[in-house]
Amino acid sequence: MNDTVKKPTGGRGDDPLPAGAALSAVAPHEPVSVVLAGGGTAGHVEPAMAVADALKALDPHVRITALGTARGLETRLVPERGYDLELITPVPLPRKPTGDLARLPSRVWRAVRETRAVLHAVDADVVIGFGGYVALPAYLAARGVSPRKPRVPVVIHEANASAGLANRVGARTAQRVLSAVPDCGLPGAEVVGVPVREAITSLDRAALRAEARRHFGFADDARVLLVFGGSQGAASLNRAVSGAAAQLAAAGVSVLHAHGPKNTLDLREPQPGDPPYVAVPYLDRMDLAYAAADLVICRSGAMTVAEVSAVGLPAIYVPLPIGNGEQRLNALPVVDAGGGMVVADADLTPELVAREVAGLVGDPPRLAAMTTAAARVGHPDAARRVAQAALDIGRTARLARGATGGRP
């Protein structure tokens, strides 16, 4: 496969860096080459892009190449952020025996061959893996690229509270293993949090609130509920919240609801004097959405929890009821700290939404306490820590090659 998606000129990967940002960088004529393996869903792509931005901030000469597949969100998100993307064969790891499982070995080795070609072409010094469809081939390929370059060091980041198969395999030979939370199932993992883009970690909700509410058409003094279910929406959240529209309006609650590009909402006709119910397929400006909101109802994927807690937004988390319950585990640190609550997907009804939302938005002191608690759980420096670990390892690898005239 090995298709290349080039970054647009003027993208984030080309941004100028602050003076002194690269004091410890390798000389410009020998830039460190970093390959990011984290494609498929936004939960894998966004942490990778946050780390890419942090790499550029630490070393403006670093070469960054992202691995992805033609079916993943990375085909849009990576070029938009200004980075090069190399496409390989997708390797979905089925949770249950299916036809995909029977085809897995041939797909894996095809993807490994393609990834080895990429690592060789970009002269990779280090691979950073985030799990997902491209991570397993990247970890296997890094074990042996060519006779001249038999091994590329690997840094792994596990965002979920329960590590996935790809990262469990990769962690066995990785140079560094980093995680969002303790006890993720990877021995020796160092807790750094989930990498979140700087636009979110530096977001001042209070300072941006007036602009954000004007952007979405809410009054300055509105009580705003934000609802989203990930990049594709969530049917159960859509049904429960839209079904509570009348009760929410009666309680004076405005709603900003991202229902997903493939979904629609069955909303009643608004009555005169009702606060706005703004329904959109997708939110391109999550910074404004977070700033406009007083409360959010959302899933609890690792990236969602990291962003919501980073901005100090009180949350009602509704874990996706699949897998090993990792979404519920992702939310527990914030919930235990007092920054949110968890509602099982099966228990999410219009009546519950109306009751809990009205109770929370009508209690400003409680919301303020939840805001403080949520913000305490966040790790705003996670992206920088992952990037620094990778640069340290990559520089060592490149310097070793320079000292020996080739790869050890």
Curated annotation (Swiss-Prot):
Binding site for UDP-N-acetyl-alpha-D-glucosamine: T41, A42, G43, N160, R197, S231, Q327
Source superkingdom: Bacteria
Reaction catalysed by this enzyme: di-trans,octa-cis-undecaprenyl diphospho-N-acetyl-alpha-D-muramoyl-L-alanyl-D-glutamyl-meso-2,6-diaminopimeloyl-D-alanyl-D-alanine + UDP-N-acetyl-alpha-D-glucosamine = di-trans,octa-cis-undecaprenyl diphospho-[N-acetyl-alpha-D-glucosaminyl-(1->4)]-N-acetyl-alpha-D-muramoyl-L-alanyl-D-glutamyl-meso-2,6-diaminopimeloyl-D-alanyl-D-alanine + UDP + H(+)
This protein's record includes keyword tRNA processing: no
Signal sequence residues: none
Pathway annotation: Cell wall biogenesis; peptidoglycan biosynthesis
Localization per record: Cell membrane
One Gene Ontology cellular component annotation held by this UniProt entry: plasma membrane
Keywords attached to this entry: Cell cycle, Cell division, Cell membrane, Cell shape, Cell wall biogenesis/degradation, Glycosyltransferase, Membrane, Peptidoglycan synthesis, Transferase
Membrane topology: Peripheral membrane protein
GO terms of biological process kind: carbohydrate metabolic process; cell division; cell wall organization; lipid glycosylation; peptidoglycan biosynthetic process; regulation of cell shape
Task of the protein: Cell wall formation. Catalyzes the transfer of a GlcNAc subunit on undecaprenyl-pyrophosphoryl-MurNAc-pentapeptide (lipid intermediate I) to form undecaprenyl-pyrophosphoryl-MurNAc-(pentapeptide)GlcNAc (lipid intermediate II).
Similarity field: Belongs to the glycosyltransferase 28 family. MurG subfamily.
Protein name in UniProt: UDP-N-acetylglucosamine--N-acetylmuramyl-(pentapeptide) pyrophosphoryl-undecaprenol N-acetylglucosamine transferase
Lineage per the UniProt record: Bacteria, Bacillati, Actinomycetota, Actinomycetes, Mycobacteriales
Gene that this polypeptide is encoded by: murG
